């Protein structure tokens, strides 16, 4: 019989000063939940969007290099190499969100997800990161849409055009064409959220 784990609220926690006991309890819980170093997970687009670094027993590499179509993970990590740490840089003034479209529960893999990170200054987007999950074998960064958003206010028109650019050239399979519309909606939602 398992005992439910209390829901954590990271917005109320000081994540810099977690106690050793809490870290060990969380590690045990996470070991029973799944693996975050797989490309289909919810966390991989977030790690790419936030410029995380993956530390292993032998090296450190950007998340974008670990989750890539160019190389297989078996080519990235040696058989005796383990992921030991994930560093996410703290960037002042960055608004980051993760939106996930799924049919059932939060434990489902995303049918489409979007990790977004924006830096705003005076109501203008200074920088943007848009990384999709669930639409490709690895997290899919949309740099053309990021460039388009830079220097613009988060308006309806800007959101529409960013969504169009983000999905430009998308070639869905016959039975998952809906993902294009869902992905466009997630981009629009992420941009318009900045107006609040």
Tell where the protein language model's regions lie, with residue ranges.
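C-terminal structural segment of proteins
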Residues: 40-196
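Ferredoxin-type iron-sulfur electron-transfer modules and their immediate structural context
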Residues: 1-44
């Amino acid at each position: 019989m398992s005992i439910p784990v209390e829901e954590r609220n990271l917005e109320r926690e000081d994540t810099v000063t977690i106690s050793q006991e809490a870290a060990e309890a969380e590690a045990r819980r996470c070991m029973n939940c799944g693996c975050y170093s797989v490309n289909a997970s919810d966390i991989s687009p977030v790690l790419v969007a936030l410029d995380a670094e993956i530390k292993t027993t032998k090296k450190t590499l950007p998340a974008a290099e670990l989750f890539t179509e160019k190389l297989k993970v078996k080519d990235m990590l040696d058989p005796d190499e383990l992921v030991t740490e994930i560093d996410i840089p703290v960037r002042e003034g960055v608004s980051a969100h993760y939106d996930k479209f799924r049919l059932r529960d939060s434990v489902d893999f995303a049918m489409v997800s979007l990790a977004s990170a924006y830096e705003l200054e005076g109501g203008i987007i200074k920088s943007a990161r848009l990384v999709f999950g669930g639409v490709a074998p690895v997290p899919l960064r949309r740099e053309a849409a990021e460039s388009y958003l830079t220097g613009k206010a988060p308006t309806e028109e800007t959101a529409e055009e960013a969504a169009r650019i983000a999905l430009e050239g998308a070639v869905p399979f016959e039975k998952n064409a809906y993902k294009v519309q869902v992905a466009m909606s997630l981009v629009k939602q992420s941009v318009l959220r900045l107006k609040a």
